[in-house]
């Protein structure tokens, strides 16, 4: 019996709270009875505007609350990564996503380049691209933020015994935090072909210490709720009821 693995995750039902053209997809437990399912769906449809479904719906956090800094350790000099080639069909999709990020105010054309990283892409399940940056060189030069992070095993214990657990993911949550203006130029990245070079105005996912910066901000915002009504691990939230 040692090789028998217990299935612990509930079966999930995918539901669309939006339209066929503008989908707003979430998931509910497959263990709900018909009455519970109807109540949950009524609640979700009524309050769906409480959630952000796309970049323009996100609001930035105040710089007075949090900014992400990019300090550089002594002995490290700016580094420019060599350019990479990409297929033409991928380049066209990258251009679309770059334009979307510019419209959202997340990135802007790079004006002063010291550090220069390459862009890499990830194809999501829906066929769209996620823009990622190879920040390995500047990450090596950045000192570690020793902010204490939650312990996952303890969080599991803290949510046990509750009847309903609601799981939420911070949609592009890192992108709600500004990069300190003096450090923005260090995030410069190169796109393929003639798309150009850009820099991040907000905090991207692949920067060292981004998780610590986000956790610090969330602990400050939800300090009177964490432990009582919710638990949080970086951008993953569990509401207990």
Task: Give each language-model segment a name.
Residues 1-15:
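Intrinsically disordered, low-complexity charged segments
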Residues 8, 16-241:
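Retroelement reverse transcriptase polymerase core
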């Amino acid at each position: 019996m040692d090789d028998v693995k217990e299935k612990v995750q509930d079966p999930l039902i995918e539901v669309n709270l939006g339209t066929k053209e503008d989908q707003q997809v979430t998931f509910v437990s497959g263990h709900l009875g018909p009455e519970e399912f109807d109540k949950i769906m009524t609640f979700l449809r009524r309050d769906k505007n409480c959630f952000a479904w796309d970049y323009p719906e996100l609001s930035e956090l105040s710089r007075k609350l949090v900014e992400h800094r990019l300090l550089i350790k002594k002995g490290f000099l700016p580094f420019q990564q060599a350019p990479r080639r990409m297929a033409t069909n991928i380049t066209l999709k990258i251009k679309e996503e770059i334009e979307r990020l510019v419209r959202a105010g997340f990135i802007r054309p790079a004006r002063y380049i010291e550090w220069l990283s390459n862009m890499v892409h990830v194809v999501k399940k829906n066929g769209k691209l996620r823009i990622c940056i190879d920040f390995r060189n500047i990450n090596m030069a950045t000192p570690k933020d020793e902010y204490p992070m939650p312990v996952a095993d303890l969080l599991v214990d803290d949510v046990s015994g509750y009847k309903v657990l609601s799981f939420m993911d911070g949609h592009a949550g890192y992108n709600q935090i500004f990069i300190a203006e003096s450090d923005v130029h260090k995030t410069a990245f190169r796109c393929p072909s003639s798309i150009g070079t850009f820099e991040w105005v907000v905090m991207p996912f692949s920067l060292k210490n981004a998780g610590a910066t986000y956790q610090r901000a969330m602990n400050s915002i939800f300090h009177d709720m964490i432990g009582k009504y919710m638990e949080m691990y970086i951008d993953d939230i569990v509401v207990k009821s």
